[in-house]
A protein has these predicted regions:
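Acidic, Mg2+-coordinating active-site environments of NTP-dependent enzymes
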Residues: 52, 88-90, 219-365, 443-444, ...
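Short secondary-structure boundary segments
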Residues: 82-85, 204, 226, 271, ...
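Short, polar loop motifs at secondary-structure junctions
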Residues: 81-89, 160-163, 271-275, 486
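Phosphate-binding loop of NTP-binding sites
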Residues: 109-267, 278, 282-285
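Short internal beta-strands
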Residues: 74, 78-84, 267-271, 394-397, ...
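Residue-level signal for inorganic ion chemistry
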Residues: 53, 72, 115, 132, ...
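ATP-dependent carboxylate-amine ligase
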Residues: 1-25, 49-54, 64-67, 143, ...
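N-terminal leader/targeting and accessory segments in enzymes
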Residues: 1-114, 247, 315, 335, ...
């Protein structure tokens, strides 16, 4: 929900959009009224319009938002914002739609971002906003960074897929949330600023960048964790996906708050990763300092070349890299590093990331959000580091429907590294679950050869698959439940079914006589 604000003069919004080159004045109407004010936020969802608010019509994949203008007006919208095609559509909806003041813009998504920031009073300018992007590791890195900054005396809010923090407290997140849409994002930044936090760590996805959700934010710094092919359902090609991620570099400009705190604009990028070379080049071309991070062979963290021994509660090299990225930023900003290291060492990590489920059983159960090929490979590496001699890795995995089909092949190939594999539903949405499972099975089977039929089981019922894997575990084994992590729903046929991966694991352990779940 947006914070309560005094009514705002629409003229100042018009001036802002004009200054940014978004306003199409000749196609706008009704903007000469001196009494035109907004008393409620802007939104692109007609169902969320409040009396006195504005409705931004965005052309979507299935419908043009302008078709919902009448509903927005019925709910009390006093201003419409639309691109020219939407303006023409609105003009056919009757006298009420024609008479309401309308701002025509060249880019409705960008206008939504700017209007949302304008309504909330540009909270990002009151904060040092750090964006964390990359294919995998964003949530853990963002969590480590918020923890590190706060411990170093620079209190930080957090907006991430699995966790939100405001003023030192934690808040629940929306189901399947990525980077929130601009109205919700700006409202959350206002909450963080109002709570007295000085920074906001924002998990910044390619969707958030490509769809202009973060277009009104001047970042103080950015972190790129890694880059591999993903989200081709949105971007089409790896090149377009990379271009979307590179937009973060363009947005690292510093805010009023970060400049006042003398925080140098930075990009934290691992130079040893060849896939990140374009990000290094873009940052250097923009005159932004690049801060390096890495992990030594013996596990020490390398913060821009400086070696630090940092014991972590989260196991595995991937989590060490995430911690190194976060601490490299703290060190580069010359904040108290010892305090930050101590806090990161104690950080258990976000829910659903290398999360252990312990009920006293003689084998380990790990819940992890890993849902791409590279992240599953990393999670399997972490799980294998926990095996005792002779132990087996038992894996439950899957892939989402209506998403990049290439992800399924990558997940299947990664899954082949497990001794036993159960392929279960993740979020089939409106896609045939058998088709999804077959893609994963076939990819794994190509690598497993003749043993595939013995090692792979397709069991769509995720609860049953988890129970089967845990029932099959012997002392010294590790059961890895991959793909859902922290998420609290399974999307199937337009319905969000309640789900809790950790609870499902505990239920299976209890049925085997291990009741003391933690």
């Amino acid at each position: 929900m947006s914070s309560k604000r005094a009514p705002q003069q629409v003229a100042s919004l018009v001036e802002r959009l004009n200054r940014l080159g978004l306003l199409l004045r000749d196609e706008s109407r009704g903007l000469d009224r001196s009494d035109l004010v907004l008393g409620a936020p802007c939104t692109h969802d007609s169902r969320q319009v409040l009396p006195g608010g504005a409705f931004v019509a965005i052309a979507g994949a299935r419908a043009d938002g302008a078709t919902f203008a009448q509903e927005a007006l019925r709910r009390g919208a006093v201003l419409l914002i639309s691109e020219p095609a939407g303006v023409r559509l609105i003009s056919t909806l009757g006298p009420e739609a024609v008479e309401v003041p309308l701002i025509a813009v060249s880019n409705a998504r960008r206008a939504l971002a700017e209007a949302s920031a304008w309504w909330e009073g540009d909270p990002a300018e009151e904060l040092a906003v750090i964006g964390v992007t990359g294919t995998d590791g964003k949530t853990t890195t963002a969590t480590y960074l918020a923890t590190a900054l706060s411990a170093a005396g620079f209190s930080a809010g957090l907006i991430s897929t699995a966790l939100q923090r405001v003023g030192g407290g934690e808040e629940p997140v929306a189901a399947h949330q990525t980077t929130p849409e601009a109205p919700a994002l700006q409202a959350q930044l206002r909450k963080i600023a109002a709570a007295g936090d000085r920074a906001a760590v924002l998990e910044t996805t390619s969707h958030g960048l490509a769809l202009d959700r973060v277009a009104a934010i001047n970042y103080a710094a950015g972190i790129v964790t890694n880059f591999t092919s993903d989200h081709l359902d949105l971007h089409g090609t790896v090149e377009e996906y990379r271009k979307a991620k590179l937009l973060l570099v363009d947005r690292v400009r510093g805010s009023a708050a970060s400049r006042a705190a003398h925080l140098e604009p930075l990009m934290v990028i691992r130079r040893a990763d060849p896939s990140l070379a374009p990000f290094v080049a873009a940052a250097e071309a923009a005159g932004i300092r690049v801060v390096d991070f890495d992990v030594a062979e013996d596990g020490a963290l390398l913060l821009d070349g400086q070696r630090h021994e940092v014991p972590l509660r989260m196991p595995g090299r991937i989590n060490a890299l995430n911690a190194a990225a976060a601490l490299a930023l703290v060190a580069a900003w010359k904040l108290p590093l010892d305090a930050a290291i101590a806090a990161v060492s104690a950080e258990p990590g976000p829910p659903g990331r290398s999360e252990a489920v312990d009920a006293g059983q003689p084998f380990k159960v790990i819940v992890d959000f890993a849902h791409t090929g590279p992240s599953l490979t990393a999670a399997i590496g972490v799980a294998r580091s926990l095996l005792v001699a002779g132990g087996r890795l038992l894996l439950v995995t899957g892939a989402a429907g209506e998403r990049d089909p290439g992800r399924r092949t990558a997940v299947g190939r990664a899954a082949s590294a497990a001794e036993q594999i159960w392929i279960a539903d993740e979020d089939p949405r409106d896609e045939d679950q058998d088709v999804i499972a077959a893609s994963i099975r076939d990819a794994a089977g190509e690598l497993l050869g003749a043993s595939a039929s013995e090692r792979i089981t397709v069991l769509h019922d995720r609860r049953a698959a988890i129970a089967a894997a845990i029932s099959a575990a012997a002392p010294g084994d590790v059961v890895l439940l991959a793909g859902k992590g922290h998420e609290r729903t399974i999307e199937r046929g337009g319905v969000d079914e309640p789900w809790d991966e950790v609870a499902a694991a505990r239920e299976a352990l209890t049925s085997l006589g291990y009741p003391q779940g933690t």
